[in-house]
Amino acid sequence: PIVLMLMVFMNVVIKLIGEERINSLAQRFSKYSLVRNCILPFLAAFMLGNPASFTLGRFLPEFYKPSFYAALAQYNHTSNGLFPHINAGELFVFLGIASGVETLGLSTTPLAIRYLLVGLVMNAVGAYVTDFTTAYVCKKSGIQLSKTAKVQ
């Protein structure tokens, strides 16, 4: 039910702000790879959680959607230590590792911070690789994906 509520809320916000404004904002965000591959997926995961965060990808140009989804899927896991609301269904992975750290008498906070920081870097690298892979596949298959945002 919460996913449905978040999706309805997002659609209401889109209607209130207007699709043209959302499109222009998405166009500005998609220009810069750091924003597109690091900041936007993290904000989507933090605000909407998994799986509702994937709906924000609809505002990005078709060419950048694969890298956004790749980064977002990874952010949903690597942010769990500090922000368990993002992906509560898979919190057991972090908690299993954290219980081993606690058994050693160590704090889990540094582990969660390192997990997040390493995740931020590796997710961005994965998204960049996905951008190159998308360009390669498009070139080989003769498909041209749009680099301008359009919402239907």
Name each model feature, range by range.
Residues 1-61:
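Membrane-embedded alpha-helical segments and adjacent helix-loop junctions characteristic
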Residues 39-40, 150-152:
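Cytosolic juxtamembrane regulatory segments of multi-pass membrane proteins
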Residues 52-151:
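C-terminal transmembrane helix pair
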